[in-house]
Amino acid sequence: MNDTLSSFLNRNEALGLNPPHGLDMHITKRGSDWLWAVFAVFGFILLCYVVMFFIAENKGSRLTRYALAPAFLITFFEFFAFFTYASDLGWTGVQAEFNHVKVSKSITGEVPGIRQIFYSKYIAWFLSWPCLLFLIELAASTTGENDDISALDMVHSLLIQIVGTLFWVVSLLVGSLIKSTYKWGYYTIGAVAMLVTQGVICQRQFFNLKTRGFNALMLCTCMVIVWLYFICWGLSDGGNRIQPDGEAIFYGVLDLCVFAIYPCYLLIAVSRDGKLPRLSLTGGFSHHHATDDVEDAAPETKEAVPESPRASGETAIHEPEPEAEQAVEDTA
C-alpha cells in the first residue's frame, strides 16, 4: 500500500514540466503534492454536486437548486485554481521586502531574494467570494424565523458585502506585487475594508435575519478564518516569514474550510430546513421614522353647494342676477 502511494506521488512531474525560473524562493515537490491533494478534494466535491444537480432537477425543490448553483460555482473556481497552483502556473516573481527566508545559493543574486507570488489564488477568491456571500444570504433568509423579507434591503446589504470583499481581495493582490514597504498600505486598506464588510454582515445576519444557533456559530467561524487569510499574507507574500510550501499548506487549509466545508453545510441546511419567504419592496426591516406618521396635508377645497332637486319634466328657472334687474329698471 505504501509503495503504491509512493509511486502515485512520484508521478508528480509538474515542476519538471513547468520549472520555476528566475526565483530564489518557490514551491517544491512537497508543496505541489499537497496542492494536488486539495485539488482532488475539490474535484470529488464537484462530482458530487454534478450528481446532485441532476437529482435536484427531477426530485429537488427550487430552494435546493438555488443553493446548489453557487456551491457548484465555488467548487469549480477552486478546482480550477488549485489545478493551476499545483501545476506551478499562474505566478510571477517579486523581490521580497525582508530577508527572513534565505536560500543556500541564490539564483538571482538579489538580497532579499525573489519570491514566487501566485496571483491565480487571488483570481479564484475574486470569483468565489460573491457566490459564497449569496449562499450565506440565501441560507439565512430561508432557514431563519422571518417570513417577510425586504428585497431592497437584501440587495442593498449584499451589494455592500460583495464590493467590500472584492476590494480587500484586490488590495492583497496589489500589495503582494509590490516589493517596497508601501505594500503594507494596501494591506491596511484591505483590512479596514474587511472590517467594515464584516460589520455589515453582522448587522444583516444577527439583527435583521436573526441568525441563531449552529448557523450563527458556523458564520462566526468563517468570519474568524477570513482574518487568518490576512495573517497568512503577512507571513508569506508580505513579510517573507514562511516558505512558499508553508504558504501553500496554510492557504490550502483555509480554502478547504471556507470554500469546501462551509458551502456544503449551507447547502444541506437550505435543502433540509429552507422555506421560501415572502419578498416585498417595502416590508421586512425598514426602520420607522416619526415623519412616516405625518400625512401630506391635502389642499383645501371649497365645498360645492348641491343644487336643489327638481321634479322630472320641470323646467329649471334661473333667477336673474341683481345687477341684471337694476339694468332693466333703469331702461324702463
Curated annotation (Swiss-Prot):
<feature type="compositionally biased region" description="Acidic residues">
    <location>
        <begin position="322"/>
        <end position="332"/>
    </location>
</feature>
<dbReference type="InterPro" id="IPR001425">
    <property type="entry name" value="Arc/bac/fun_rhodopsins"/>
</dbReference>
<feature type="topological domain" description="Cytoplasmic">
    <location>
        <begin position="56"/>
        <end position="65"/>
    </location>
</feature>
<comment type="function">
    <text>Probably cooperates with other heat shock proteins in the translocation of polypeptides through membranes. It may counteract the altering effect of heat shock on the plasma membrane.</text>
</comment>
<feature type="transmembrane region" description="Helical">
    <location>
        <begin position="66"/>
        <end position="86"/>
    </location>
</feature>
<feature type="transmembrane region" description="Helical">
    <location>
        <begin position="249"/>
        <end position="269"/>
    </location>
</feature>
<keyword id="KW-0472">Membrane</keyword>
<feature type="modified residue" description="Phosphoserine">
    <location>
        <position position="308"/>
    </location>
</feature>
<feature type="topological domain" description="Extracellular">
    <location>
        <begin position="179"/>
        <end position="181"/>
    </location>
</feature>
<feature type="transmembrane region" description="Helical">
    <location>
        <begin position="35"/>
        <end position="55"/>
    </location>
</feature>
<keyword id="KW-0597">Phosphoprotein</keyword>
<feature type="modified residue" description="Phosphothreonine">
    <location>
        <position position="331"/>
    </location>
</feature>
<feature type="transmembrane region" description="Helical">
    <location>
        <begin position="216"/>
        <end position="236"/>
    </location>
</feature>
<dbReference type="GO" id="GO:0005886">
    <property type="term" value="C:plasma membrane"/>
</dbReference>
<dbReference type="Pfam" id="PF01036">
    <property type="entry name" value="Bac_rhodopsin"/>
</dbReference>
<feature type="transmembrane region" description="Helical">
    <location>
        <begin position="182"/>
        <end position="202"/>
    </location>
</feature>
<keyword id="KW-1133">Transmembrane helix</keyword>
<feature type="transmembrane region" description="Helical">
    <location>
        <begin position="158"/>
        <end position="178"/>
    </location>
</feature>
<keyword id="KW-0812">Transmembrane</keyword>
<feature type="transmembrane region" description="Helical">
    <location>
        <begin position="122"/>
        <end position="142"/>
    </location>
</feature>
<feature type="topological domain" description="Cytoplasmic">
    <location>
        <begin position="203"/>
        <end position="215"/>
    </location>
</feature>
<feature type="topological domain" description="Extracellular">
    <location>
        <begin position="1"/>
        <end position="34"/>
    </location>
</feature>
<comment type="similarity">
    <text>Belongs to the archaeal/bacterial/fungal opsin family.</text>
</comment>
<keyword id="KW-0346">Stress response</keyword>
<protein>
    <recommendedName>
        <fullName>30 kDa heat shock protein</fullName>
    </recommendedName>
</protein>
<dbReference type="InterPro" id="IPR043476">
    <property type="entry name" value="Yro2-like_7TM"/>
</dbReference>
<feature type="topological domain" description="Cytoplasmic">
    <location>
        <begin position="270"/>
        <end position="332"/>
    </location>
</feature>
<feature type="topological domain" description="Extracellular">
    <location>
        <begin position="87"/>
        <end position="121"/>
    </location>
</feature>
<feature type="topological domain" description="Extracellular">
    <location>
        <begin position="237"/>
        <end position="248"/>
    </location>
</feature>
<dbReference type="GO" id="GO:0005783">
    <property type="term" value="C:endoplasmic reticulum"/>
</dbReference>
<feature type="topological domain" description="Cytoplasmic">
    <location>
        <begin position="143"/>
        <end position="157"/>
    </location>
</feature>
<feature type="region of interest" description="Disordered">
    <location>
        <begin position="290"/>
        <end position="332"/>
    </location>
</feature>
